[in-house]
Amino acid sequence: MIYLDNAATTLRKPPQVEQAVLDAMRTAGNPGRGAHEPTLHASRLVYAARCAMAKLLHAPDPSCIAFAANATEALNIALGGLFALGDHIITTVCEHNSVLRPLYRLREQGLQFSFAGVDERGRLQYDDWDKLVQPNTKALVVTGASNVTGNGTDLAKAAVFAHRHGLLLIVDAAQTAGSQPIDVQALGIDVLCFTGHKALLGPQGTGLSLIHISEPTRH
C-alpha cells in the first residue's frame, strides 16, 4: 500500500516511537504523584519531553510547555481560558473545526469574532485584515496551514499585524509542527498548539500547548 494521508496522521511510526510507547507502559508510573522509582522515572520523562519541545520551538523556557491529549483539546483550553464576555477575535476561513467549534460555542456566551477571507486560490488576503480590527479585539487566531487546501499562513505577516494592534497571536500548528521550522520567540507567537501524531511521528493521544505571552496586549 502507498500511504499518502500523513497530513491526517502518520501511519507507520519509527521503531524508536514504538519502543518508547512500550517502555512507558512497562516502566513509567504517575508523574508527580509519588517518590518511588517508576513515578520519578515518569517525571524525568515528562521533563525531558518538555525540554525537547522547548528546544524544537525555540521557547524561552520548558515551563512554557503544557501537554494535552491532542491539538483540539489544547486549542479548546486556550480559547476557552483567555477571553472574557464581549471580547472580539479575528480568525480566518481556513481554520480547522478545533478552532471554529469552540468559537461558535463561545459566541453563545458573548464572544465576538470576524473572519479574514481568501482569494480565488484559497490564499489569505492579508491587506484586508486591518478592516477587521475593533476596539475590543483581543487576538488573532490563525492556522499554520490549511488542512483542506494545504495553503500556508505567512506567520511573519500575521505576527507583524498582531503586534501592531496589540493582539495575542494564537497559532494552530497541527499541520506544520515537525514539517516546518517554528521559532516562537522570533515570530512573537503567544500561544502555539499542535498534535504529536502527524509530522512529529508521535503516537495518537499526544498534543501540546506552548504559552509565552510576552508583549503587553489590549485591556
Please identify what each model-predicted range represents.
Residues 1-214:
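Pyridoxal 5′-phosphate
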Residues 215-219:
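Short "domain-exit" segments at the C-terminal end of structured domains
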